[in-house]
Amino acid sequence: MKNNNCINKKTNKIIKACMPMHTYGFPCRIDEIKKICDEYSIFLIEDAAESVGSLYKNKHTGTFGHIGAMSFNGNKIITSGGGGCIVTNDEYFAKKAKHLSTTSKIPHRWDYDHDTIGYNYRLPNLNAALLFAQLERLDDFIDNK
């Protein structure tokens, strides 16, 4: 530890982020991980790809850190044929994610001005409809798992 930073012993670099994974629907020891991350100002990104709908202490996995990442690939508990989402309570990250995932378009009279490299990470309507229908039945899918 140096200046209240957590240091990687092999690289001697400051650990800036941690990405714990909730595997097969089972929450990891997120309380312990979050406590360490909070103590050393480490950014916490949860990999909740395999735990959509899982709860830990009555709170959804993916909602303990700064950002939670979820997957809707074909092998997950609910699927849209692909895609995923992130969840956050941080307004800055929410706006940044939306901006980047919608081609980084900014309001402009030509309607095609971009302020940075953007991506088209939006689900097609058909895939989104499939996902929405499954989200409504998420509890049933979890009970049958």
Task: Please place each PLM-identified region on the residue numbering.
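Active-site phosphate-binding strand-loop segment of PLP-dependent enzymes
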Residues: 1-80, 85-87, 92
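Active-site region of PLP-dependent enzymes
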Residues: 51-57, 64-144
